[in-house]
UniProtKB/Swiss-Prot annotation:
Molecular functions (GO terms): phospholipase activator activity; phospholipase binding
Signal peptide span: 1-22
Keywords recorded for this protein, A-Z: Chylomicron, HDL, LDL, Lipid degradation, Lipid metabolism, Lipid transport, Secreted, Signal, Transport, VLDL
Short name of one Pfam family: Apo-CII
One of the protein's GO biological processes: lipid transport
This protein's name: Apolipoprotein C-II
Gene name in the database record: Apoc2
Family listed: Belongs to the apolipoprotein C2 family.
Lipid metabolism found in the keyword field: yes
Its biological purpose: Component of chylomicrons, very low-density lipoproteins (VLDL), low-density lipoproteins (LDL), and high-density lipoproteins (HDL) in plasma. Plays an important role in lipoprotein metabolism as an activator of lipoprotein lipase.
Region (Lipid binding): 63-71
GO cellular component: chylomicron; high-density lipoprotein particle; low-density lipoprotein particle; very-low-density lipoprotein particle
Length: 97
């Protein structure tokens, strides 16, 4: 029993003495996929926004500006109404009433 005890103790100490290592990454300094996608999305968004602002500044007319503001206010009011209806329907569906 003495040799088995020492053998078991040796194996336990050997296991505890070794570090548990995960898989090694090829390049730990490379950015994550989500960061890369987020950066590309933000670059596309900023370029599209800059193009839209440039087009707006180039073709600025007061009548068009008034129409755009009116259209925005009406569409945002409609979207808030439809969002409220959708939220109400979703809550009713989840409650089961």
């Amino acid at each position: 029993m003495g040799s088995r005890f020492f053998l078991a103790l040796f194996l336990v100490l050997l296991v505890l003495g070794n570090e548990v290592q995960g898989t090694q990454e090829d390049d730990p300094s490379s950015p994550a996929l989500l960061d890369t996608m987020q950066e590309s999305f933000f670059s596309y968004w900023s370029s599209a926004r800059a193009a839209a602002e440039g087009l707006y500044q180039k073709t600025y007319l007061t009548s068009v500006d008034e129409k755009l503001r009116d259209m925005y206010s009406k569409s945002s009011a409609a979207m808030s109404t439809y969002a409220g209806i959708f939220t109400d329907q979703l809550l009713t569906l989840l409650k089961g009433e």
